[in-house]
Amino acid sequence: MEQNGLTAVIVAGHGSGFSRGYIRYFADVHMWEGDSLILIPLDGEPMHVQVTYASASMPDEMWIKDYRRAPEPQKEIVNAMKEKGLTKGKVGIAGLQKRITVGGYETIKNAFSNVAFVNADRMVDQIRGIKSDLELEQLRSLWEMSQRAMDRFVEVIGPGITQREAASEAARVFRGAGSFTDLTLIEEGRFKGLPRDVPLACDDMVSFHLEICGESGHWSEINVVCAYQEPSELERKLINSEFRALQEVRAKARPGTMLKDLEDTFLQVIVDDGWKLGDPEWHYSFHGQGMDSIERPYFSPMIEGNEDAPLQEGMVFSYHPHRPTIPEVRRVPKIFDGFVITKDGAETLTKDWDFLWRIMK
């Protein structure tokens, strides 16, 4: 803050998978819904305020002692800034781009004619991007639990069991481990979406995608493919190509490497194996992951939406690059991983995980 000439930072959060992480990071409070704001002065104690219905989980020992509830948190921020004499200078807002509400920002800005409010998103994202040893321990535990949930899905699926019944068995694992925020997607045939009360056919391929916000507030993203027909020659070739690309990307992912370099490494392996590349699709090949399911930095093969950056030791990424190929492959590999950047390359957060298809008998 001092280096950036800030007298304070206002941290904004909202109860959703992409925007509650700021609040959890600074206050260890898991938001269910609603809005939350934290005032962190350069000198003095912080203040945290939430709408009354926002809290889902509070720490036994509050990290921020000055904790308030208010139907309009921004008004309490105004009060606290006046109490602390923060009526001039430069104040950063972390979450200005996507987290703070328009009304909240306008109320705070209009209350202080002598304060210059500036975007502090990148400053806070850079701090959060490097995970502590404790966070890495929590992430490894979360990924281990995520794998157990996926294994349970594989154990129970079969012809006739409904999508919801199968997904619920996986949910028993992560609910029992303290996770209450998730995304579960099932893909079979032409259907892809939230589980429905529809029997699985289990005659071709079933894909199960799981994103979990764990007890510590961190996220994981993992996928499993259950194949009821052996891979064709082309499918097996692409599976092998993408698995080799995963290994090459891990080796390349050292401090100083750009995310675009990882994308180029992935694509080069595919091309070297004799594939021609189709048109890119809009998705993130790599994105930071921590207390938000998607965090800076991130890379997309499309120009729009990129936040490319050099890798730093301790960063954590979700890995899921892909590119349509020529010739086209009907069933694609769907390889997902999570890894932490080390000086020796990427260390996977999975443990003895089978990234290849599960061939169901």
How would you name each of these model-derived features?
Residues 1-361:
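Active-site neighborhoods and metal-handling regions in enzymes and metal-associated proteins
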